[in-house]
Swiss-Prot record:
Interacts with NIK1. Interacts directly with EXA1. The gene is RPL18B. Signal peptide: none annotated. Residues 160-170, 177-187 have a biased composition (Basic residues). GO terms for cellular component: chloroplast; cytosol; cytosolic large ribosomal subunit; large ribosomal subunit; plant-type vacuole; vacuole. GO terms for molecular function: mRNA binding; structural constituent of ribosome. One of its GO terms (biological process) is translation. It comes from Arabidopsis thaliana. The keyword Cytoplasm applies. This is Large ribosomal subunit protein eL18y. Ubiquitous. Keywords: Cytoplasm, Ribonucleoprotein, Ribosomal protein.
């Protein structure tokens, strides 16, 4: 017995209709944005709602240095990130800016507020910009995760820059490949 597929033998791609997380605050934010999507004709709210459903991997964090870079010349607008804002010690001067995010690390929040900026939550944003007016929607770098470094063509294949999964970093483990007989081959 097979299964009856309606779309002529293709199973449709699935997409999330609710967050997987049991976080009650996230669920309340979703409830609020569901209402806004239904009652307003704003694309911004739809994007926010879709991103609230995403998995943690797809809600990449954004560092203060990138935030400052992206917001240069847009200091009067509100930066919006569905994810975490993290501190970056490499940046010394922070302009006063308004930032909305799901969470802020302790130091990032302290530094933004010390510079005369504001750290907003999504329910505060909904009151200030119900249609997303004067906002800059940002995303963190998804491919900066450690795990992503291992993806791609197999390590050892020509022109591959994938990181091998190595048990240890010692002399005997994937060191001197091509220079020593015992380590793969010798040229």
């Amino acid at each position: 017995m097979g299964i009856d597929l309606i779309a002529g033998g293709k199973s449709k791609k699935t997409k999330r209709t609710a967050p997987k997380s049991d976080d009650v605050y996230l669920k309340l934010t979703v409830k609020l944005y569901r209402f806004l999507v239904r009652r307003t004709n704003s694309k911004f709210n739809g994007v926010i709602l879709k991103r609230l459903f995403m998995s943690k991997v797809n809600k990449a964090p954004l560092s203060l240095s990138r935030l400052v870079e992206f917001m240069t010349g847009k200091e009067d607008k509100i930066a919006v990130l569905v994810g975490t804002i993290t501190d970056d010690l490499r940046v010394h001067e922070i302009p006063a800016m308004k930032v909305t995010a799901l969470r802020f690390t302790e130091r990032a929040r302290a530094r933004i507020e010390k510079a005369g900026g504001e750290c907003l939550t999504f329910d505060q944003l909904a009151l200030r910009a119900p249609l997303g007016q004067n906002t800059v929607l940002l995303r963190g770098p998804k491919n900066s995760r450690e795990a992503v470094k291992h993806f791609g063509p197999a390590p050892g294949v020509p022109h591959s820059h994938s990181k091998p999964y190595v048990r240890a970093k010692g002399r005997k483990f994937e060191k001197a490949r091509g220079k020593r007989k015992s380590r793969g081959f010798k040229v």
